[in-house]
């Protein structure tokens, strides 16, 4: 039995609140149960130096957690003068995941930065950031389209979403909350497109290596879960 009472293949309640920020070109407050992340997409009329005069744009991401997003207050990384390794890893993952479904040539020489700020953390912050970040990116591109800068269907090739899966109490489960994640035998994150293409898989065994059969079980859970998330994304942007 999972601590939350959920079935092994049952995700937490997921919601998207679009246009949460009045200033950003695109924004979304995404909630995976008690994990809440504010994703904003900001358009800049510039590209990284290595892309200048290439006609290509760029999509990148930054990630952070508010000091009291967790059970005990964390010091702001800015106060320490540098980002931690976990933060850098997660924001690179978010950027890679979103770029996987963007035609950078069709975007033109512009940069879109996704800022994913965790308001409340209860496991799965990186997967929530990717899934909600796609909504914010979509709305940013719609903003650009409304000003005749691009055509969304030429720039955005597909949906992308992410979910965590793991082995908890000898069972393959989906969408781990913090309690499960902190004591899981295996923890994995899956990033996939709406068409089912795999963008990235991160998997780690805690103590006991996991088997190919267990990995296949996690993969099946993730594929079904991401299908549900993509359906929710479609529902959100249609509203």
UniProtKB/Swiss-Prot annotation:
Entries under Gene3D superfamilies matching the protein: GHMP Kinase, N-terminal domain
One of the GO BP terms on file: rRNA processing
Keyword Nucleotidyltransferase included in the entry's annotation: yes
Sites where the protein binds phosphate: 86, 124-126
Keyword line: Nucleotidyltransferase, RNA-binding, rRNA processing, Transferase, tRNA processing, tRNA-binding
Catalysed reactions, semicolon-separated: tRNA(n+1) + phosphate = tRNA(n) + a ribonucleoside 5'-diphosphate
InterPro entries for this protein: ExoRNase_PH_dom1, ExoRNase_PH_dom2, ExoRNase_PH_dom2_sf, PNPase/RNase_PH_dom_sf, Ribosomal_Su5_D2-typ_SF, RNase_PH, RNase_PH_bac-type, RNase_PH_CS
Domain of life: Bacteria
Pfam families: RNase_PH, RNase_PH_C
Entry EC no(s): 2.7.7.56
Molecular function as annotated in GO: 3'-5'-RNA exonuclease activity; tRNA binding; tRNA nucleotidyltransferase activity
Quaternary structure note: Homohexameric ring arranged as a trimer of dimers.
Family that this chain belongs to: Belongs to the RNase PH family.
Stated role: Phosphorolytic 3'-5' exoribonuclease that plays an important role in tRNA 3'-end maturation. Removes nucleotide residues following the 3'-CCA terminus of tRNAs; can also add nucleotides to the ends of RNA molecules by using nucleoside diphosphates as substrates, but this may not be physiologically important. Probably plays a role in initiation of 16S rRNA degradation (leading to ribosome degradation) during starvation.
PANTHER family in the cross-refs: EXOSOME COMPLEX COMPONENT, EXOSOME COMPLEX COMPONENT RRP41
HAMAP family reported for this sequence: RNase_PH
Protein name: Ribonuclease PH
Source organism: Rhizobium etli (strain ATCC 51251 / DSM 11541 / JCM 21823 / NBRC 15573 / CFN 42)
């Amino acid at each position: 039995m999972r601590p939350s009472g959920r079935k092994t293949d049952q995700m937490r309640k997921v919601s998207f609140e679009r246009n949460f920020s009045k200033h950003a070109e695109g924004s979304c407050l995404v909630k995976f149960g008690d994990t809440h992340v504010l994703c904003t997409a900001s358009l800049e009329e510039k590209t990284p130096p290595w892309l200048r005069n290439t006609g290509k744009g760029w999509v990148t991401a930054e990630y952070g957690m508010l000091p009291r997003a967790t059970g005990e207050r964390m010091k702001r990384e800015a106060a320490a003068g540098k980002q931690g390794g976990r933060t850098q890893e997660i924001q690179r993952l978010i950027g890679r995941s979103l770029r996987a479904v963007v035609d950078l040539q069709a975007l033109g020489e512009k940069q879109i930065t996704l800022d994913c700020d965790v308001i409340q953390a209860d496991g799965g912050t990186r997967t929530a950031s990717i899934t909600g970040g796609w909504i914010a990116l979509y709305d940013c591109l719609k903003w650009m389209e409304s000003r005749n800068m691009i055509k969304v269907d030429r720039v955005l090739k597909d949906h992308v979403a992410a979910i965590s899966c793991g082995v908890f109490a000898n069972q393959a489960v989906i969408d781990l909350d913090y309690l499960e994640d902190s004591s899981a035998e295996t923890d994995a994150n899956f990033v996939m497109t709406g068409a089912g293409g795999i963008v990235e898989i991160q998997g780690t065994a805690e103590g006991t290596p996991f088997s190919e059969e267990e990995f296949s079980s996690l993969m099946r859970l993730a594929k079904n879960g991401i299908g549900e998330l993509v359906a929710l994304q479609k529902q959100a942007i249609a509203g």
